[in-house]
Amino acid sequence: MMNNGCDEVSPRSEIALLGSVETMLEKIYEKHNHRLPISVETRRKLSSISEELALETLRKVFNKPYLKTLDGLIMYFVKGTVTVDGSPRLSPGESPVQSPRTPAKKSCRASQDVSLDLETPSPKFMKREENGGSKYIPPLLALGELEFKKAFLLLSYIGGESLVEEVISGDQIRKWKDLPMVSYEAAVWNRLGQRYCSPKERRRPLEGDSGMTHYYQCHVATDGSYKFKGHLLENTGTHLHKVLGDDNVLTVKFDKVLGVETYCNDLYSTYKGIAKNGIMVGLRRYRFFVFKDGGKEEKKKDVSTKGVKCYFIRTDSTASIDMQNPYIFAGKSMHEARMHFMHVNTLSSLPNYMSRFSLILSKTKTLEVDMTGITFEQIDDIHCHDQDDKDVLDKNGKPCIHSDGTGYISEDLARMCPVNIFKGKSMRSNNIQSKNLNFEGQGPCGQEPPLLIQFRIFYNGYAVKGTFLTNKKLPPRTVQVRPSMIKVYEDRTLSNLSTFNSLEVVTTSNPPRKARLSRNLVALLSYGGVPNDFFLNILRNTLEESKTIFYSERAAFKAAINYGDDQYTADMILVGIPLDEPYLKDRLSYLLKTERNALKAGRFPIDESYYIMGTVDPTGELKENEICVILHSGQISGDVLVYRNPGLHFGDIHVLKATYVKALEDYVGNAKFAVFFPQKGPRSLGDEIAGGDFDGDMYFISRNPKLLEHFKPSEPWVSSSKPSKIYCGRKPSELSEEELEEELFKMFLKARFCKRDVIGMAADCWLGIMDPFLTLGDESAKEKYERKKNILKLIDIYYDALDAPKKGAKVDLPPDLEIKNFPHYMERDPKRDFRSTSILGLIFDTVDSHNAEEPPPSEISKLWYFEDEPVPKSHMDKFTSWYENYRSEMSQAMMETDKVKRNQLTNEVIQRYKQDFYGAAGFEDSNKSLEELYPQALALYNVVYDYAIQEGVAKCTFAWNVAGPVLCKFYLKKTKDKSVVASTSVLKKLLG
């Protein structure tokens, strides 16, 4: 490189820049064919600002279509940025301010690589400067004095701009420092957000959002720049968030790189800078830590993310507010940090490394128990034996087991577990006190513990997942786990390393949901001999009853509990609110549309059918074709159909004998809601049913007499695919820490960008081939044979693809199995769709031709009890302003064009207002008395309905979304009607 001016020494050696900055300079030289290097003064300016600002400056230069003077343009962009001690950054290894745990290192990488060793300068190294005779504080340094929530909000409101004096001064930031969060947000929005963001990006906080998980988001562009979003609030949290704290976890989304479907190797070069240097959030650095592949849920996810979520965690910080408190991962590598969660270094392959580690991302509820006082026992799995009592081996040569994923927990520990948990969230109590609603969500004194608990355990380096069966025979404070449940073992060489020990509850065995059929299940039942009239009769009866939804409390209540996404509509009906109440009538109209869409897809209710969690029989008394089913009334007897979603094979529906097992009561007592499978036979019954196991899988159980009369079972599925390939790559323990991070990040990028949706494609092609197959007669034997052969191939591919993420396998869909024409009810392409005459096509057409008449909209009026009750003017004034703010926020959220994101934003707005109203996540968690809530709910109701009278019934929604439980209780109080206690599930049963 040529020298500049009369200097005899290369300016690069005199003024040292970070490797990432040098790399960006080289790119600029190459793109713009700039032969002369930048001047010493320009290098000095670049060295005087943070790495983040220097890179942002050079990106702006790089993106210019042409350059006149490179030095002049850089100096223009740098003007006003933070100066570091008024002098150039020292060369690597010479900084006087270093972390005692992480000495600065010299980078030995080639010039095109990006350095990851150098840290952001310490605040001690960033001083106030004289600026025209007055002192000022650099904005970035001032930001480091704010609590993280405030700092992140400010960064999100500058829309990706650099935090420089031209944007906002450090002194102004300090003036906002002590403002309450609501006032702070308003000030920052008025000064910055309105200028740099669109209205939909505003995040108006409410006081009292504590207790909810804050998800801080970052969006990374292909040029390496990034913008901050959020934060989003949720009632559920992950083990990762609970251990580190919400502000130390960053959810990161990467923009799609054009052409990566065919050039996946280009991905890492695009995002290498982020992988190496991490993401700077002010003066905090966050690095890649973990990602989770959606796997089985992938088809349901937002296609823009393909079900893959990526998380970075904070490593180090030079923010003054952070320097006051020690941070466990300061100066540690990501691999070292992971060891505090589980000893993933013991795993044999990289795919296993990340799939196991992602267990910390499950949405869970922590069991509040002292882990040091629990006895952990390892018991053997129950092996499958042949007629000679020898172990049966699977296609990979491993023993088949009956107990895959299930163990035991002592009764005292099970009683400590909260009931009615689903995916880490406390569901509303299933006990509805009709005419006297009881929403406390607590069972009666002495309530039985959950029969089954789906969980995650992190303990001394171990990671365990599966289900616990409550076992009254175990001594107190004891859990028993099997090898099939242990996903990560302890590394005894790390015995002195502290670990984040916890028992996390995912889901408990809850009262069964209203069972509905599905397209897959209808197709398999039809193949098994169930006549079309069986399905069509149920369908017609359901459609006829739906006609009375606006006039019959029975029909309205059934629709509310079957199709409502909350319980408030059902509550309104149960307390006697008239069906023509404007909001309730509008909700019933919505439920009618929801029901019709569900019926079109074959999702209609079926009598005497349930979805319940499965486990293995602890007594050993059940025979090969027997199961034990415990429902509300206890154990049932007789033949039942058993199926598991998303089964596609003809033999995925079994006919089994439900058997009473007296000895089981000695284990579980009176606990309810589970199905027990035998521990006898050459193959697990759970595995025979769509490859199921007992780590939380839900099984469809039906004792519907007409189904049992007609259905003829087929032979169960046996995989015909080849044995899994043996992993030949290097073990995680054989990689250097730098190599490990690079490989893990590449795995994430491939999962995020390069993977075809084989699961969804195989399922769609299966249905497209299966549909005509159902209508073929014996005269079409050859076509039936060919179609069945392809169906079986697709089933193998589908099941292999479901398990691929955790095995690191690659599954492809051969072109000869891909189809272009689909049945019309799938609504893919009207020009290509064929007219289906199968039961699925008949179901779709029957619903489509059924025009339910809806009554005309009612004039909006208030309920007399709510309008007549006096409400303090102070409450009316408060909620008038409150409602105006809500409408403003909701209109901004509705501007989002992406449906998934829009729903997320609108739900967040509603949740935050509920949090503010109750001082908690909802009514069930609130410590406020009803006497305090009644006048506030009535004020909100009257304010909202006054507005709705002018603007339409849709505006009524807010009052019920927020204050619905309180309004129902108040209405019941005013009617002075008698009440009875009833369970939702029992009401469903009584109503048919």
Curated annotation (Swiss-Prot):
Belongs to the RdRP family. One of its GO terms (molecular function) is RNA binding. It is an enzyme of class 2 (transferase). The lineage of its organism: Eukaryota, Viridiplantae, Streptophyta, Embryophyta, Tracheophyta. The keyword Lyase does not apply. Probably involved in the RNA silencing pathway and required for the generation of small interfering RNAs (siRNAs). The gene is RDR3. InterPro entries: RNA-dep_RNA_pol_euk-typ. It holds the Pfam family RdRP. Coiled coil: none annotated. It catalyses: RNA(n) + a ribonucleoside 5'-triphosphate = RNA(n+1) + diphosphate. Its EC number is 2.7.7.48. PANTHER family: RNA-DEPENDENT RNA POLYMERASE, RNA-DEPENDENT RNA POLYMERASE 3-RELATED. Residues 88-113 are annotated as: Disordered. This is Probable RNA-dependent RNA polymerase 3. One of its GO terms (biological process) is regulatory ncRNA-mediated gene silencing. Keywords: Nucleotidyltransferase, RNA-binding, RNA-directed RNA polymerase, RNA-mediated gene silencing, Transferase.
